[in-house]
């Protein structure tokens, strides 16, 4: 991000929001692929409408909120856009959903993890958000907007060969792989590398082994300890054939040599593949602004 956008500053400074899991068997995300996709499309349209703003036509923003928002999300949007609406300078902010994956879907309620890109006057920035939406009278309305979210995963379905069980096994595997890949300690660089190497396979494993000395030295020189934040979030973008692509978000907790801790939002895509009873990463693609 070259320069912080007014709205993005508000988005990334919002409080992390927690949520609740749904009962086992209640999560139809990717199980009912057609309705999951339709719900994600509806949430995408609603999010892009209410998170864009043109100071030359403020009434359009109010109309978008009235049509697409309910419950707590109304107050959340008021807070997020308070400074933007008071700006003495013209604002033309366009928000697009870059990626989105369903965390849970129950037919009349959907929660998704989305990467937003905001553009204004040639500058751009990213934010990762968890949206909750409710179907009301045949229309999906946003009911909660959690920026830099840390929310518990839905209760997992048994790994019994069903689509839901495969999905949740892949997500658990992706979270475990992410914990090993993105957790490092400069006082134990060799151990940090070994933990990462143990959770990768295929081309990624070849790359790690070829660059082992470089990785170990980079960890040692960093002078930091990095850990995942609480309740890291993972949602499947695709699933099939013992493979999955997972959208993963956490706020990394980075501790420097003086003991100071800084939170760094981090979003990435992980390709994972089933390897016996475990899942291993075959590719990692950090999500950055276009």
Question: Which residue ranges define each predicted feature?
Answer:
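Surface-exposed, charged secondary-structure patches
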Residues: 86-123, 220-258
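A broadly structural signal marking compact, well-ordered functional cores
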Residues: 16-22, 196, 206-214, 220, ...
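Intrinsically disordered, glycine/charged-rich N-terminal periplasmic/extracytoplasmic linker segments
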Residues: 70-78, 82, 96-105, 110-111, ...
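Short beta-strand edge/turn micro-motifs at domain boundaries
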Residues: 124-158, 245, 265-290
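A compositionally biased, intrinsically disordered/low-complexity signal enriched
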Residues: 40, 50, 69, 102, ...
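Juxtamembrane and targeting peptides
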Residues: 2-45, 111, 127, 146-183, ...
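A mature extracytoplasmic/lumenal domain signature
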Residues: 81, 116-118, 146-149, 212, ...
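Core segments of small alpha/beta cavity-forming domains
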Residues: 31-86, 162-221
């Amino acid at each position: 991000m070259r320069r912080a956008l007014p709205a993005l500053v508000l988005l990334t400074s919002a409080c992390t929001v927690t949520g609740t899991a749904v009962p086992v068997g209640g999560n139809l995300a990717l199980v009912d692929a057609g309705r999951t996709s339709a719900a994600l499309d509806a949430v995408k349209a609603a999010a892009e409408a209410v998170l864009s703003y043109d100071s030359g036509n403020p009434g359009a923003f109010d109309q978008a909120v009235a049509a697409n928002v309910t419950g707590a999300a109304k107050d959340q949007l008021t807070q997020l856009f308070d400074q933007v609406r008071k700006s003495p300078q013209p604002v033309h902010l366009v928000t697009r959903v870059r990626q989105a994956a369903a965390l849970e879907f129950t037919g009349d309620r959907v929660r998704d993890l989305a990467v937003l890109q905001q553009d204004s006057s040639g500058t751009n920035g990213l934010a990762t958000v968890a949206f909750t939406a409710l179907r009301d009278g045949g229309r999906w309305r946003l009911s909660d907007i959690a920026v830099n979210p840390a929310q518990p995963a839905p209760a997992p379905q048994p790994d019994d060969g069903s689509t839901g069980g495969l999905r949740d096994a892949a997500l658990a595997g992706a979270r475990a792989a992410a914990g090993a890949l993105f957790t490092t300690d400069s006082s134990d660089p060799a151990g940090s590398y070994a933990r990462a190497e143990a959770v990768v396979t295929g081309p990624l494993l070849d790359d790690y082994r070829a660059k082992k000395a470089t990785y170990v030295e980079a960890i040692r020189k960093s002078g930091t300890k990095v850990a995942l934040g609480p309740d890291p979030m993972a949602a499947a973008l695709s699933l099939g054939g013992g493979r999955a692509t997972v959208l993963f978000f956490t706020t990394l907790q980075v501790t420097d040599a003086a003991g100071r801790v800084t939170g760094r939002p981090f979003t990435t895509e992980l390709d994972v593949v089933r390897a016996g009873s475990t899942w291993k990463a075959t590719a990692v693609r950090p999500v950055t602004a276009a």
